[in-house]
A protein has these predicted regions:
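Conserved nucleotidyltransferase catalytic core and NTase-mimicking acidic/glycine-rich helix/loop elements
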Residues: 118-248
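Short N-terminal helix-initiation segments at or just after the protein's N-terminus
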Residues: 6-12, 33-34, 97-105, 144, ...
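Conserved NTP/Mg2+-binding pocket subregion across the NTase superfamily
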Residues: 4-7, 56-147
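Helical scaffold of the NTase/Pol beta-like nucleotidyltransferase catalytic core
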Residues: 1-24
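Generic structural marker for isolated residues within well-ordered, non-membrane alpha-helices
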Residues: 13, 55, 163
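Catalytic metal-binding acidic patch
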Residues: 26-71
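Short aromatic-enriched loop/helix-cap "lid" or pocket-rim segments at secondary-structure transitions
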Residues: 38-40, 80-81, 178-180
């Protein structure tokens, strides 16, 4: 993977050092091939920033770089037509372009801002629900065994997904650039107080007497996310909302 990454970084340099004003656009997937993205790969949200002088930074949850484009509205739209499960983010000087399922739109936000009225794709929602369901069984098992260390480990392991879930049910795009736990922003979300309470309970836990508090807060969070993702999304202005029925 390191060799592939080095190859792609070199490709970035060659394309952007010639014109530092070009906006970078990156697609990422779990497999690398010359033709671009693999539709069946596990795709996460990825950005590449290009600053004056050709400096660049990469941010990603998983996957490796597969193809880089210049800013080209028609080509971007074509990407979404051909690859149904890709979200693309490209930005420069506080301008951010976010597109999902081919609905191209310009949002006057900085890269760190939370975007209002975000319509999450059924693909990403399905992944979130799956991850929470899998970890829930392990958390229940740790609680029944009164294994505080394992319960804390599992809660922190799933913590980013809890945060992502809260942003989703509040119709906001989840933060992607290291802002997973921003206490002030999270407290503004429905259910944000529960997440903060969970974090504090974990941080201050010292004995097995704390296991009930941690577990109860987690279950309140889980129940909130489960109830919201089981019904709230039906009212969204999503032309493809019928696809939600496959997993709600």
């Amino acid at each position: 993977m390191d060799n592939i990454r080095d190859e792609i970084i070199q490709n970035v340099k060659e394309k952007f050092e010639a014109d530092s004003n070009v906006i970078g656009l990156v697609l990422a997937g779990s497999s690398f091939n010359n033709s671009g993205i693999n539709k069946n790969s596990d795709i996460d949200f990825v950005v590449v920033t290009i600053s004056p002088g050709g400096q660049f930074e990469f941010y990603h949850d998983k996957g490796i770089w597969v193809e880089i484009f210049y800013e080209d509205e028609e080509r971007i739209k074509k990407c979404f037509e051909d690859n149904d499960e890709i979200m693309i983010n490209c930005f420069k000087d506080g301008r951010i372009l976010i597109d999902n399922k081919g609905l191209l739109g310009e949002l006057k936000k900085s890269a760190m801002d939370i975007v209002e009225d975000y319509e999450i794709s059924d693909y990403n929602l399905k992944r979130l629900k799956y991850r929470l369901q899998v970890i829930l069984l392990k958390i229940k098992n740790a609680y029944l065994k009164k294994d505080l260390d394992k319960l804390i480990f599992l809660c922190m392991y799933v913590f980013p997904h809890l945060i992502r879930g809260l942003y989703i049910i509040n119709h906001k795009i989840p933060p992607t650039l290291g802002l997973w736990y921003d206490r002030d922003r999270i407290l503004k979300l429905e259910g944000g107080d529960l997440l903060v309470n969970l974090f504090e309970a974990i941080k201050n836990s010292s004995s097995k007497q704390d296991i009930d508090e941690i577990y109860n807060i987690f279950m309140q969070l889980n129940n909130l996310l489960d109830s919201k993702t089981g019904g709230a999304f039906k009212g969204w202005k999503d032309k493809r909302k019928e696809h939600f029925q496959t997993f709600l």
